[in-house]
Amino acid sequence: MQRSPLEKASVLSKLFFSWTRPILTKGYRQRLELSDIYQIPSADSADNLSEKLEREWDRELASKKNPKLINALRRCFFWRFMFYGIILYLGEVTKSVQPLLLGRIIASYDPDNKEERSIAIYLGIGLCLLFVMRTLLLHPAIFGLHRIGMQMRIAMFSLIYKKTLKLSSRVLDKISIGQLVSLLSNNLNKFDEGLALAHFVWIAPLQVTLLMGLLWDLLQASAFCGLAFLIVLALFQAGLGRMMMKYRDQRAGKINERLVITSEMIENIQSVKAYCWEEAMEKMIESIRQTELKLTRKAAYVRYFNSSAFFFSGFFVVFLSVLPYALIKTIVLRKIFTTISFCIVLRMAVTRQFPWAVQTWYDSLGAINKIQDFLQKQEYKTLEYNLTTTEVVMENVTAFWEEGFGELLEKAKQNSNDRKISNADNSLFFSNFSLLGAPVLKDISFKIERGQLLAVAGSTGAGKTSLLMMIMGELEPSEGKIKHSGRISFCSQFSWIMPGTIKENIIFGVSYDEYRYRSVIKACQLEEDISKFAEKDNIVLGEGGITLSGGQRARISLARAVYKDADLYLLDSPFGYLDVLTEKEIFESCVCKLMANKTRILVTSKMEHLKKADKILILHEGSCYFYGTFSELQNLRPDFSSKLMGYDSFDQFSAERRNSIITETLRRFSLEGDAPVSWNETKKQSFKQTGEFGEKRKNSILNPVNSIRKFSVVQKTPLQMNGIEEDSDEPLERRLSLVPDGAEQGEAILPRSNMINTGPTLQRQRRQSVLNLMTCSPGNQGQSFHGRTASSTRKMSLAPQANLTEMDIYSRRLSQDSGLEISEEINEEDLKECFIDDVESIPPVTTWNTYLRYVTIHKSLVFVLIWCLVIFLAEVAISLVVLWLLKKTASQDKGNSTQSINSSYTVIFTSTSTYYVFYIYVGVADTLLALGFFRGLPLVHTLITVSKILHHKMLHAVLQAPMSTLNALKAGGILNRFSKDIAILDDLLPLTIFDFVQLLLIVIGAVTVVSALQPYIFLATVPVIAAFIMLRAYFLHTSQQLKQLESEGRSPIFTHLVTSLKGLWTLRAFGRQPYFETLFHKALNLHTANWFLYLSTLRWFQMRMEIIFVIFFIAITFISILTTGEGVGAVGIILTLAMNIMGTLQWAVNSSIDVDSLMRSVSRVFKFIDMPAEESKPPTKSFKPSKDVQLSKVLITENHHVREDDIWPSGGQMTVKDLTAKYIDGGNAILENISFSISPGQRVGLLGRTGSGKSTLLSAFLRLLNTEGEIQIDGVSWDSITLQEWRKAFGVIPQKVFIFSGTFRKNLDPYGQWNDQEIWKVADEVGLRSVIEQFPGKLDFVLVDGGCVLSHGHKQLMCLARSVLSKAKILLLDEPSAHLDPITYQIIRRTLKQAFADCTVILSEHRIEAMLECQRFLVIEENKVRQYDSLQRLLSEKSLFRQAISPSDRLRFFPHRNSSKHKSRSQIAALKEETEEEVQETRL
């Protein structure tokens, strides 16, 4: 970044903003890079500002019982704020005085007032000086206020972030990530722009008082008629504003509904294609869009009338002010012109400035109060450590995640009594609520000496993670004592990767030791992975380590924990995503050897780990079930494996299952209170699942994939699209609605982070607490099938280096000695790297081609524009007729000017009134005829239709695009098109285009009229308009690029916040908060650099426009004064019109810039529409939903791809020849020359290390990748049939389960092919019936938020049911048991045996016992097939499979390998049943 010229700029350069010229010139000539942006002035740096505000806030906290953030802000910023306010007031006063001088100039042309003629020239000079003065005062004042607003925002952002890092886990459990992000996003730039309007709260009333005083002098009491009309108008506009908010609230619910399904579709686009659901999804989204557009139209019409009311009010204000006075007394022309000029200023003050100022204060104070409440939340307390202690001791410790649980239990009991549940269910219900108030850990005691390994085991939700949290100080014990030295290292259950290099992630700010670092990498099996990169361990990882596989992320997290030299290592299920072989090696080399002399606490459920541990602690429902050694365990607790694995026996299979479903379901409804059920009582209590941590986690751990949801639709809740998410107990925020047009929601867009919050955060999200975010795996951990983006699917070794994220900017290399010494300079190369994903290939200024395409996309639009032009020509013609009459009357007037006019009646019809009538029409330049009032409606209506067409085309294009194209895009980027850009096309663009067309026509009309009066003026107008057009073109190139860089600069702020929250426990365990605060300040400074420069260049442009206008006005004033002879009218008309033409022309130029900026959204949408399609499909009927389609009604659509007589495939034989697969065109091959064949009905297991390409092979079968080679099914080659028909041959159970928002029926059968009887039959087969029957509405129960009420196991069963319903002959399973509880796992195994007995099954799996049912195995290593053989052959050779099975397992599974095949098989089956519990690995 370059040094800012502002630092060396002179006073004049600062006053006129000339210091921005170098960047404007550069931006005009070439594309701006981040390195071209100037550094921020030190006064604006986040470090200085946050330190200042933090000091004042601490003072406020210390000195008062009831601290107020506004007081701290006042002490920091008040005097500068007032200084600029006074300058702004002086600038506004000049506007009020101008009409006085104008009146005097007009009076000097009165034939009876010849003595004043001599001073007309001086009055002209005075008038011009007022304009010059206003220009010099106004722009520096507005810029100064913008800057103070920006500084306030930066200081508050920093304070919020610092507070977030200090919050206690209990508080984090109650705050959702959406609330935190909205706390920042809603206030981003709200203060910057709002502060300039804030002063009008006192300026506008003073101005109105001054103007009314001057008008009283002219018109006496009748002046108040005009003011009364304006006040009524302001109230009318406020009423329209409220009406618009009502429509917008209704519509926001529909927008939310549409975006929920769209986001689910984009996230799971691979599943949508695999299931051939493109048409079903398209029709579902389009039907919601239909309803949404009806409400959009209503809101647009209201807003159109609101806008028109302002334009047309000018006529009535003047008319009502002048009319009573004219009827009582005679009126001279001078007074009319002066009144017109006064009324223009008055109208602006009453209907725009004052309401906007009140709205700004209302919004800003609301935001400040919310931030103040947040800053007073409870912070976490670190435990008092004893550095001399060597052992870890816990004595009788009990802890609760929730405070005040007793009260909650009472409420819960009361609540369930109200519901009158039957006795059978009641016991379940209460057993559940007793958990709510139960401690998460009860009376836990243990002691481990230095160097010992303690293994902690237990079923899901037993309190294992809570135990580690307690040792770290994240959870406070309510009784008992904990003792340890305090030097802790921690490895989280869900691997957390910070943006930066692999090396930075492992060292994590600890001093660098080469030998230690190499040992750790070797022990964690990272050497091979790192060697595949050109940059080795200096490769920059994207947000969340998205380019890595789950196993690679897990190993890096473990390496980070091991690298730190600590006394106590807490390892929370570090092996969750590793394959059996890797896990075994790492446990041996890392946990047992490298850390042999360290104290370790390992959470695990593996028998091998328990055997090697010095001590074992088994937890069950928060209590200590067993503590001792492994041999003691075998003697004392023979039933331990059932407690460890979380189930007692398969004998009570169905009862246990039913019980778990009911309790799970009831718990979710009663505690979350946001499911769409009719239990309003629960909603009122608004329990937010504040139970013990184990119970809370059960929800997210059995369900890890849905844990990070972007949107949710909560039925019948009105939502707003402007990114505000209120506290759950607060009513929907009602804006004061004084402002008619309000800030539209198009711009308040959230970060384009892949993991979370892509697109706007919609209000009333399903509450996903921050704690949940920290305890949940990202949706795409350890998978490549159904990956969210190219980056998530590409494994570490294959990721191209271009794909970096915004965060890479400021994740600088950690210094060798200490992570805290971060260089202030941001490396330019990194700045460039950072935006590679996001830089759009759209030219800085919208091309004419885009405009042409937009106008011609709907045939009516051209006619509507012609219609506007015709009406305008009619209006100009009327003006010219009036002008002709005026000249005629004026010439008559000269003849009989002596005629006395006594009658007040005739005075209205004198020559004066012809001037008056004429001016009222064009003079205010917006008082058009009644016809004009409605002329814009067809335009607005047609533009919304265009938006509908574009949305439809874009949705179709995305659904039909090949995966290679979609892989190259970010999920957030695609969703932004459907949220932000479509919102702009619906809301902002139609009215902005209408405003622009209206203003442009007004200017042309006014210029025509003035030129007819005084031809010299036409000569002055032409160069001025030319200068405006050139200035606009010059400025536009730079401003659009700066805006783009600014919006890209927002992403790192939010990405960093979310990243920090996900890894908060790790951060605090390593004490890295100061480093992350520094990184956050860097992100803020980067955004500030772009925003500050944008504000400065904008002021430069506005000031230049004002200067051109002042020069033009000076020229016009002197031309008219020197060339006009006798006659009051002409000078009055010319000067009043000139003042107005320029104001309107400035507005028109600004409006054209807005149109250009908004048309970029159209360019982006066209870019998506032009994406290539996968393959042409058979023609299908176009879909028009009926007028009253609602989401709650089941939408049955015809599936055109299913043929009645379809008998292919019949057997399921599969032949693969020379298959090569790539993720993107021209990328590296992920699989090379794969050839093998599968007999009908055979089961094939895929073996290979994490990231070897097993999931990729399954994707290639479905033609989701760029493939070469050939696959045949039952002799039919994939080239000979359509894609849809090919994919129909497969049933798929993906690793990432896809449940969209809709009914159970819709989720199982989106095309509506099967009747209820068939669906129930299949639900029965896969064990889903008991689940579905628990819900009100059964099959018609609407699932929301990725099926949040279902456990992960239930979702897997849904996928299984889909496959059974599809009657596919080949079944692909991608790690179906990754997160399953043992019961669901057994159901899936049983169903595979029964329902798919005669199908070909291809299985990718980590569990050994699941693989044993396969007849053949395909071993993949280094992108190629290493072996393809039977189980017996693999066990006899030195294969990967043989290495993965420990000798004890081999004995257990294959005791009589030499006996006959049949006997061996039945033996295996029997043994499997017996030993199921021992080998079961419950994924956490």
UniProtKB/Swiss-Prot annotation:
It is a multi-pass membrane protein. One of its GO terms (cellular component) is cell surface. Residues 99-122, 217-222, 320-339, 882-920, 1014-1015, 1119-1132 are extracellular. There is a cross-link at residue 688 (Glycyl lysine isopeptide (Lys-Gly) (interchain with G-Cter in ubiquitin)). Keywords: ATP-binding, Cell membrane, Chloride, Chloride channel, Endoplasmic reticulum, Endosome, Glycoprotein, Ion channel, Ion transport, Isomerase, Isopeptide bond, Lipoprotein, Membrane, Nucleotide-binding, Nucleus, Palmitate, Phosphoprotein, Repeat, Transmembrane, Transmembrane helix, Transport, Ubl conjugation. Its EC number is 5.6.1.6. A motif (PDZ-binding) lies at residues 1482-1484. The modification Phosphothreonine is found at residue 717. Residues 423-646, 1214-1447 form the ABC transporter domain. It is found in: Apical cell membrane; Early endosome membrane; Cell membrane; Recycling endosome membrane. Coiled coil: none annotated. The keyword Ion transport applies. PROSITE patterns: ABC_TM1F, ABC_TRANSPORTER_1, ABC_TRANSPORTER_2. Glycans are attached at residues 896, 902. A lipid is attached at residues 524, 1399 (S-palmitoyl cysteine). Residues 1-77, 147-195, 244-298, 359-860, 942-992, 1037-1097, 1154-1484 are cytoplasmic. ATP 2 binds at residues 1223, 1248-1255. Residues 1390-1484 are annotated as: Interaction with GORASP2. N-glycosylated. Phosphorylated; cAMP treatment promotes phosphorylation and activates the channel. Dephosphorylation decreases the ATPase activity (in vitro). Phosphorylation at PKA sites activates the channel. Phosphorylation at PKC sites enhances the response to phosphorylation by PKA. Phosphorylated by AMPK; this inhibits channel activity. The modification Phosphoserine is found at residues 549, 660, 670, 686, 700, 712, 737, 769, 792, 797, 815, 1448, 1460. Belongs to the ABC transporter superfamily. ABCC family. CFTR transporter (TC 3.A.1.202) subfamily. PANTHER family: ATP-BINDING CASSETTE SUB-FAMILY C (PTHR24223), CYSTIC FIBROSIS TRANSMEMBRANE CONDUCTANCE REGULATOR (PTHR24223:SF19). Epithelial ion channel that plays an important role in the regulation of epithelial ion and water transport and fluid homeostasis. Mediates the transport of chloride ions across the cell membrane. Possesses an intrinsic ATPase activity and utilizes ATP to gate its channel; the passive flow of anions through the channel is gated by cycles of ATP binding and hydrolysis by the ATP-binding domains. The ion channel is also permeable to HCO(3)(-); selectivity depends on the extracellular chloride concentration. This is Cystic fibrosis transmembrane conductance regulator. It comes from Mustela putorius furo.
